[in-house]
Amino acid sequence: MRRRLRLRRDALLTLLLGASLGLLLYAQRDGAAPTASAPRGRGRAAPRPTPGPRAFQLPDAGAAPPAYEGDTPAPPTPTGPFDFARYLRAKDQRRFPLLINQPHKCRGDGAPGGRPDLLIAVKSVAEDFERRQAVRQTWGAEGRVQGALVRRVFLLGVPRGAGSGGADEVGEGARTHWRALLRAESLAYADILLWAFDDTFFNLTLKEIHFLAWASAFCPDVRFVFKGDADVFVNVGNLLEFLAPRDPAQDLLAGDVIVHARPIRTRASKYYIPEAVYGLPAYPAYAGGGGFVLSGATLHRLAGACAQVELFPIDDVFLGMCLQRLRLTPEPHPAFRTFGIPQPSAAPHLSTFDPCFYRELVVVHGLSAADIWLMWRLLHGPHGPACAHPQPVAAGPFQWDS
């Protein structure tokens, strides 16, 4: 009965917040939403073997997913040429107020001395309520997973179109509506972190440094942190299994590591970086921003290092610069697929959206809210997937039979 009431409450909150969000989006339909994808690097470090997955079940695996209307992913918002003057004027402004906080997020689950084993931090934008709901009710559910305490936060800035109205009072009105919606969502789920900077692609670096500072202050004893985008699917059981032998007091940052990536000098590119901003021929090694994991010790060290490194407009490259300052090398792992699962040339007919692939991975990037729901149900439903290999192959996260 309690479970039924909780599901009914979640459905009602989803409908109310979704309806309010739809009305506001309709009123602000000319505004553009920021894109939070990572730059495509050139060259990869050699991967290490994937740890075998362990079957696990998250709460409410049988719950019906909410209906998503028009859930086809929208194309990325076009980004104009790099604005030199604006970047140079604002690049040293790195402190913005926290408008919505969750100060008690990491105080355990009521047990004395309780602390999260894993904090999930998801980059999101105000308009992306559907994906936040999908994450909350699937792989990002809070509670105990395989005995580990998991907590969750979403990282947001002020909506890009909130203050762009023709008159000041129109822009301020939209800003007030957005903040009211996010406060209602925060009261319902206690997982929203909102800062006062504009939520744009080039401000993702601000989101990075503000989260590191927040986690160091409000989650000082967290063992591990997973940080990723809202359009990823995470196999939390595999992630916890990978972390089980690791010491949170030792340095660790693991993910889809990109090495020898060269700055893009083409002005039309979203990732265009002029030589005046970065003059070296290649970036330091960095983990793709779609999803990576770090230890509590590395969290605190990064928070300090990133406060001293000059801001850079691409967030995951900036984090690589902070790691370089600490003389830390990110650890590559083949089960972090921040560029999705490539279609094998030898089997063009094979579907890569297959639970038998996903159950052996940790992170897959680039899914819609409906895809996240569907894959979670396929993996954690009452029967589970019927796969040819009951255990993952040792050579990598998956392979195709010849």
Curated annotation (Swiss-Prot):
The gene is B3GNT9. InterPro entries: Glyco_trans_31. Residues 32-83 are annotated as: Disordered. Gene3D superfamilies: 3.90.550.50. It is a single-pass type II membrane protein. It is an enzyme of class 2 (transferase). Keywords: Glycosyltransferase, Golgi apparatus, Membrane, Signal-anchor, Transferase, Transmembrane, Transmembrane helix. This is UDP-GlcNAc:betaGal beta-1,3-N-acetylglucosaminyltransferase 9. One of its GO terms (biological process) is protein O-linked glycosylation. PANTHER family: BETA-1,3-N-ACETYLGLUCOSAMINYLTRANSFERASE, UDP-GLCNAC:BETAGAL BETA-1,3-N-ACETYLGLUCOSAMINYLTRANSFERASE 9. The chain crosses the membrane at residues 11-27. Its EC number is 2.4.1.-.
